[in-house]
């Protein structure tokens, strides 16, 4: 056994890549990478992953270059997930892979884009970014000669669709039809929890976006450090930073407070997860799946503090008038493009026009939705300009 202070023995309930349930389409194994590491590399090399660099979280891309995008967010989630998985003795490759892939189905313009595509697709089966992520990795990415999608391992697919918990209650929704169809052929155990690694990815997502939305919100001038002083978790940490380091300017004070808050949340997840593992006596990955609650979790106190922080962010950031203004503009762009493409599919690019042929209206709508969902913010703005502004002819 290693004497390194950073060595953590493998947990008995960690996923073992040597015992993976495999891929839908059999492939020879790599001599240099585990199956989960191969999945990670396949996700990184997709065009969908690259396009995340110009898809926004809250702010539309043209609002500024310092704000986080889906790509930077995914990288931050992956870093937290890998570190947390390593500290808990889990498979860090699998946790990192699920974290990197969890957002690649998001459309342009953040949640405003998802809301608008859901509205556009209401009569045609709906839209859900989690389902779209699954469709990207199982169908829409076309990089290999023998199959569509990425042919990821069972464990990665399970984690992508179930990282937030069992999804059986969602299967009746029209937007989840693709998941139900896939599950009928390749059972994903949708009524159980996912692996501990997938649960780590979900908590890493919470840790990353809560902290970094605080950072971006102050950077954007939507609220100040003083206004955070009464908010649970961040308030006491901010007070401690100001007391211990009065020499720091506002920027370094903010960054130090965010750094400490990330550390506090990671420590809380580690403590709560180890406590739950001891209480439940889990001894295998299947034991984790068969629990009636999550294994990886925040403590009750931390969960309460986070709920109040999210409420602050919802009021002061996500529904700020500046953000609402860009949301309105973004929704109009997508709605107008969707209507035109559905009515006149021959204005779609050749590849997408070909996909729309020999389909009923619902099928054509899905192709249009897939095309729009894959756009970046900047591309959507430019495409809309070309389609609707006559001055582009001048």
From Swiss-Prot:
<dbReference type="InterPro" id="IPR006261">
    <property type="entry name" value="dGTPase"/>
</dbReference>
<feature type="region of interest" description="Disordered">
    <location>
        <begin position="1"/>
        <end position="34"/>
    </location>
</feature>
<protein>
    <recommendedName>
        <fullName>Deoxyguanosinetriphosphate triphosphohydrolase-like protein</fullName>
    </recommendedName>
</protein>
<dbReference type="InterPro" id="IPR050135">
    <property type="entry name" value="dGTPase-like"/>
</dbReference>
<dbReference type="InterPro" id="IPR006675">
    <property type="entry name" value="HDIG_dom"/>
</dbReference>
<feature type="domain" description="HD">
    <location>
        <begin position="70"/>
        <end position="210"/>
    </location>
</feature>
<dbReference type="GO" id="GO:0008832">
    <property type="term" value="F:dGTPase activity"/>
</dbReference>
<feature type="compositionally biased region" description="Basic and acidic residues">
    <location>
        <begin position="16"/>
        <end position="34"/>
    </location>
</feature>
<dbReference type="InterPro" id="IPR003607">
    <property type="entry name" value="HD/PDEase_dom"/>
</dbReference>
<dbReference type="InterPro" id="IPR023023">
    <property type="entry name" value="dNTPase_2"/>
</dbReference>
<comment type="similarity">
    <text>Belongs to the dGTPase family. Type 2 subfamily.</text>
</comment>
<dbReference type="InterPro" id="IPR026875">
    <property type="entry name" value="PHydrolase_assoc_dom"/>
</dbReference>
<dbReference type="InterPro" id="IPR006674">
    <property type="entry name" value="HD_domain"/>
</dbReference>
<dbReference type="Pfam" id="PF01966">
    <property type="entry name" value="HD"/>
</dbReference>
<keyword id="KW-0378">Hydrolase</keyword>
<dbReference type="Pfam" id="PF13286">
    <property type="entry name" value="HD_assoc"/>
</dbReference>
<dbReference type="GO" id="GO:0006203">
    <property type="term" value="P:dGTP catabolic process"/>
</dbReference>
